[in-house]
Design a protein with these regions (language model features):
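Short histidine-centered beta-strand/loop micro-motifs
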Residues: 38-43, 61-66, 108-110, 134
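Conserved short histidine dyad/triad with adjacent acidic residue
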Residues: 32-36, 50-66, 101
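Ligand-binding loop in jelly-roll beta-barrel domains
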Residues: 101-127
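Structural motif
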Residues: 72, 79-81, 88, 104, ...
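Short, conserved beta-strand element in jelly-roll/cupin
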Residues: 51-55, 65-84, 122-124
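Short acidic-glycine-tyrosine-enriched beta hairpin
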Residues: 86-102
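A short, N-terminal "cap"/entry segment at the start of jelly-roll beta-barrel domains
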Residues: 1-46, 137-165
Length: 165
């Protein structure tokens, strides 16, 4: 058995240059021994578990969808706004919701206190999982280059055989 207490899991902070996006993440799966870059299933978990904290009036990240990853959310405290293709709804403590591959979403703190939730992902983006993210508002893609390194690209529509023959 592997065991860890949340108070012992380091919290990682990340925010955008202008501050619109700001989050604190405790990656529980890594604390339990998951090797992020390993393709060996014995060194990976079948899912990723993290606890996320978003400060007031901030968003986790831009509106996006995953190509191969499903994400299950469980709100622990605070008040959040969840945007999807149909608009935005408010979620609070005890609410659970799921996004499957191709379903664009964005989580934002809609309250005066931190918005805190668990997220469980079935297909971690690290390693060779093949997941990528699409950002509909900007037309960008995030793809895994090597290990955990992401490359952000913005393409234009082209013919399938362009540059191939």
């Amino acid at each position: 058995m592997r065991k860890v207490n949340l108070k012992d899991v380091p919290e990682q902070e990340r925010k955008s240059p202008k501050g619109k996006f700001h989050k604190f993440v405790k990656n529980i799966s890594i604390a339990l021994g998951r090797e992020p870059e390993s393709l060996d299933l014995a060194k990976r978990h079948p899912f990723d578990l993290a606890i996320v904290r978003i400060p007031k009036r901030k968003s986790y990240c831009p509106y996006h969808s995953h190509s191969a990853e499903s994400e299950l959310y469980l709100v622990l405290s605070g008040r959040g706004s969840v945007r999807d293709k149909d608009g935005s709804i408010i979620v609070t403590e005890g609410d659970a919701f799921l996004f499957q591959p191709g379903e664009a979403h964005q989580l934002t703190n809609a309250g005066d206190e931190d918005f805190v939730y668990y997220v469980i992902a079935d297909n971690p983006r690290s390693g060779g999982s093949g997941d990528s993210c699409f950002y509909p508002d900007s037309g960008k893609w995030a793809v895994v280059k090597e290990g955990l390194e992401e490359v952000i690209v913005k393409g234009k529509e082209t013919d399938y055989f362009d540059g191939e023959e």
